[in-house]
């Protein structure tokens, strides 16, 4: 389901007519022709513990989204569920309040780690996983940790399994190999190679607001998402809660593009 959503948006960005542009601006609050800055990382895949340099790229919002969705599609195409589980660490890096659970074993099924014994989250990833894992190893090494809340979500639409997975994949850092060689600067600029995700964060990131409520009675993350959109802030492209809105499509909306 999430791959169908991403393919739909990939096609919309390839078409990019008046309808697609208007829908994009309505969802994100920012026009596609605006210029934004985007941070990515230069990584040394031969020495993954020693090299991690940030770079900043200026592009139009449209070019940023087009390349981002292409990379997200590649990641999603690699994700799979394997019926033969592999035991992984009990330690939960997303939730400090959760210690080891006595007699509890945690298993990974393909790329998905079953942590449904906790309702602290729907899902999470380690953002820097793409800094130490090249694209040809995504199928073997990338992990999506699944919490209990994920299973109560509908398949597609708002706050769904599909949009949640798009949210999580957007967290992975966009990376380039330290020794990458390009035929020309034009080739480098135009490349939409399958390296990492988008590098989004859960904003505001100065605290844990999973259960915090604003003065208006809304979850802090959701209120902040609305504020960014209404102020037409370019930070909507840094915030996974805003980013996932573009992927809140239902089944019929995805079918339309295949006619």
What is each model feature region?
Residues 1-162, 172-259:
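Predominantly extracellular/secreted Zn2+-dependent metalloproteases
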Residues 168:
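Walker B catalytic acidic pair
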């Amino acid at each position: 389901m999430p791959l169908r959503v991403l393919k739909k948006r990939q096609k919309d960005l390839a078409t990019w007519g008046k309808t697609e542009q208007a829908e994009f601006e309505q969802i994100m609050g920012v026009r596609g022709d605006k210029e934004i800055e985007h941070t990515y990382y230069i990584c040394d895949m031969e020495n993954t513990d020693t090299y991690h340099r940030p770079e900043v790229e200026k592009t139009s919002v449209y070019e940023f989204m087009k390349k981002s969705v292409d990379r997200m599609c590649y990641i999603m195409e690699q994700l799979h569920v394997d019926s033969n589980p592999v035991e992984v660490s009990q330690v939960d890096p997303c939730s400090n309040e959760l210690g080891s659970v006595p007699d509890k074993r945690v298993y990974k099924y393909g790329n998905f780690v079953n942590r449904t014994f906790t309702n602290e989250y729907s899902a999470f990833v380690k953002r820097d996983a793409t800094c130490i894992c090249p694209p040809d190893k995504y199928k073997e090494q990338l992990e999506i940790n699944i919490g209990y809340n994920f299973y109560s979500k509908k398949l597609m639409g708002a706050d769904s399994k599909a949009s949640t997975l798009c949210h999580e994949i957007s967290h992975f850092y966009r990376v380039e190999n330290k020794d990458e060689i390009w035929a020309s600067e034009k080739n480098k600029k135009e490349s939409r190679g399958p390296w990492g995700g988008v590098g989004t964060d859960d904003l505001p990131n100065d605290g844990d607001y999973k259960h915090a409520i604003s003065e208006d009675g809304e979850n802090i993350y959701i209120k902040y998402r609305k504020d960014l959109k209404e102020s037409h802030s370019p930070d909507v492209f840094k915030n996974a809660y805003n980013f996932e809105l573009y992927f809140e499509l239902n089944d019929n909306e995805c079918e339309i593009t295949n006619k």
